[in-house]
């Protein structure tokens, strides 16, 4: 925490990125030399690796955990608004995409913001957010039911890797945010990163989506009595796909903040089974960038 206060975020980001690339150098060389012949591993290796990697801690869905999580993320939003936007006092109407419980918007509401939160499902909506005036709506983010230029600020946490068509969602966000307004996104893990399948309660093996065919993962989870894997919950977009998306809309959106956050803790699997990766992507950074943080300013 002390380091975060002393060293600016962009400096920390550059240092971490440099360290990550140095650490990944050997794995990258092995990956680049690997043949592109499609390769998958078998049941016995999956069984062995599954025993090696423990299950992660459960995400807290109790009221106190949801409140703490919402408060923390709302503070991030307010810090971004204060530090990175030109018209801080004019940012009053805020839209959250993929809100789930709406608790982030609740804490923004308590700071005097007019908040609207949408999600494709309504079962997660928290009554506390409703009670305090957050407008919670069940709605598809790819088909927003709002007038053009309705909001000063749009944000989304941990949802863009789930949206079936991120481009449609981004286009809709551009449409409903005011000219001069902002779109702030933080999301991950990206599909090609170690935890990209989001099968946390089923398959603990990092990069399992590269190492094993989907049918084997599904059968393994069933045979072991693990939670069924919902392959449709992720859109399978890579870092490369998102970078191309940003470029397609660069005439409408100016990047104010942009960070690619790396995770290089499972490079041993890339070094040991390089063809499993090379046959599915040719861009090494797809494998080691875990998440993206970006703040756009709508310029057109």
Each language-model region and where it sits:
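Conserved N-terminal segment of class I S-adenosyl-L-methionine
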Residues: 2-143, 153-157, 287-292
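Short N-terminal helix/helix-N-cap motif within the alpha/beta-hydrolase-1
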Residues: 102, 163-168, 194
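Short aromatic-enriched loop/helix-cap "lid" or pocket-rim segments at secondary-structure transitions
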Residues: 129-130, 194-199, 266-271
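Short catalytic micro-motifs in class I SAM-dependent methyltransferases
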Residues: 158-162
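A short glycine-rich, Lys/Arg-flanked "PGG" loop and its adjoining helix->strand segment in the class I
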Residues: 167-182
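Conserved class I S-adenosyl-L-methionine
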Residues: 182-215
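Acceptor-substrate binding/catalytic loop of class I
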Residues: 225-241
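C-terminal lobe and adjacent flexible extensions of AdoMet/dcAdoMet transferase-like proteins
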Residues: 249-300
């Amino acid at each position: 925490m002390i380091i975060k206060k002393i060293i600016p975020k962009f400096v920390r980001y550059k240092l971490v990125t440099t360290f990550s690339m140095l650490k990944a150098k050997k794995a990258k060389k092995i990956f680049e030399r690997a043949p592109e012949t499609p390769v998958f591993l078998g049941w016995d290796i999956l069984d062995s690796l599954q025993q090696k990697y423990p299950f992660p801690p459960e995400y807290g869905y109790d009221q106190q955990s949801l409140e703490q999580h919402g408060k923390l993320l709302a503070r991030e939003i307010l810090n971004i608004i204060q530090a990175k936007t030109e018209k801080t006092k004019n940012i009053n109407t805020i839209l959250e995409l993929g809100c789930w419980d709406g608790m982030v918007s609740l804490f923004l509401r308590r700071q005097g913001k007019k908040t609207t939160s949408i999600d494709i499902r309504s079962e997660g909506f928290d009554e506390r957010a409703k009670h305090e005036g957050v407008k919670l709506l069940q709605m598809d983010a790819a088909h927003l039911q709002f007038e053009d230029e309705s909001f000063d600020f749009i944000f989304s946490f941990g949802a863009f890797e789930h949206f079936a068509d991120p481009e449609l969602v981004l286009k809709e966000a551009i449409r409903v945010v005011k000219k001069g307004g902002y779109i702030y996104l933080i999301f991950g893990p990206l599909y090609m990163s170690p935890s990209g399948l989001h099968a946390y309660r089923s398959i603990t093996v990092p990069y399992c989506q590269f190492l094993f065919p989907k049918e084997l993962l599904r059968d393994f989870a069933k045979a072991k009595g693990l939670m069924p894997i919902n392959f449709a919950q992720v859109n399978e977009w890579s870092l490369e796909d998102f970078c191309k998306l940003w470029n397609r809309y660069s005439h409408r959106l100016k990047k104010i903040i942009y960070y690619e956050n790396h995770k290089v803790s499972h490079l041993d699997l890339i070094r040991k089974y390089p063809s499993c990766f090379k046959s599915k992507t040719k861009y090494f950074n797809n494998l080691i960038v875990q998440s993206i943080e970006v703040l756009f300013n709508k310029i057109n």
